[in-house]
Amino acid sequence: MKNTINSLIVATALSALSVCADAQSFQRILERPVNIVRSEWEYDNDGNQELNYYNEDYCNYYLYRVNDDSYNLRPGKNTVFKRMKDAQYNNLFNRATTYMFFRGSFPKDFNINTPYAFPVKNGMQTAWKTDRRESVRTLQFRMLPGDTVYATRSGIVCRTMLPRQLLICHADYTFAAYLAMNENFVSPGEEVRTGQPVGIAGPTGVSISFFFLDKNKFSGLEAAGYVYSHFTPVFRTAEGDVKPVERKMYNALVDDELIMLDMSKREQKKYLKSKK
């Protein structure tokens, strides 16, 4: 009887871990919260008819329309079509079409050599290995359960389905999805800084997938299946900026130059002044 009870406890624990892991999988973090993007036909103050899309997220979405114009939807109101009052032309949005929403926008000024920080405390050692639980390129970093997870790059926190999920959009429209954390310190809409504590590592440390919406996946008449591309960034270490080799240990370095990488000149000046 005792063995049966112990087996049930173990099975329940494993089931809970499985559900937790699934909830923090990369595919789950890409899911769009209900009604996060909605459309409305409305009239402006001059009586012109508008088709407006409202993006209630803090990050961009891409409205893809098959065989037709597509649009970037920034946070807030986006007018994608306007018919002037008493105009005689046809409304192109009245005809049937297939459309889809995707997180993000095509990257601007993307540079594969842009340096990132390791998700560990400045000066600590870490390594990465491929997270085999994910079907896309995901880096599982060597950390102890309960260790603090630090932001690898500055950006804005996007809305997700669950509070422990963390998705950050960077200035060039690349993303970092932080997976398998036990706790998330930051909230949607919050601007995080490189090296800022963002959460607590789970039983397997933390896994991060770096990715972007790939324009090349839309080169045909329709989106070619999976529309994101994943990459391994260059990381800043005590030995310099390196493309890290899997399972090799590195000394993490977070310096002022890295922290200020995506800041405007005004923000840089304010940051340096705050350190005096």
Could you tell me what each predicted segment is?
Residues 66-96:
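Intrinsically disordered, low-complexity Pro/Gly/Ser/Thr-rich segments with frequent PxxP/GP/PP motifs
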Residues 151-185, 205-209:
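Zn2+-dependent peptidoglycan hydrolase active-site motif and core
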Residues 112-116, 187, 209-276:
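Acidic, glycine-rich catalytic/binding loops that coordinate metals and/or anionic ligands
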Residues 87-121:
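Terminal connector regions
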Residues 1-27:
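Bacterial Sec-dependent N-terminal signal peptides
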Residues 23-76:
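Cationic-aromatic interfacial patches
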Residues 149, 155-157, 189-201:
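A structural signal for short beta-strand/turn segments enriched in small hydrophobics and glycine
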Residues 125-150:
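Short glycine/threonine/proline-enriched tight-turn/helix- or strand-capping micro-motif at secondary-structure
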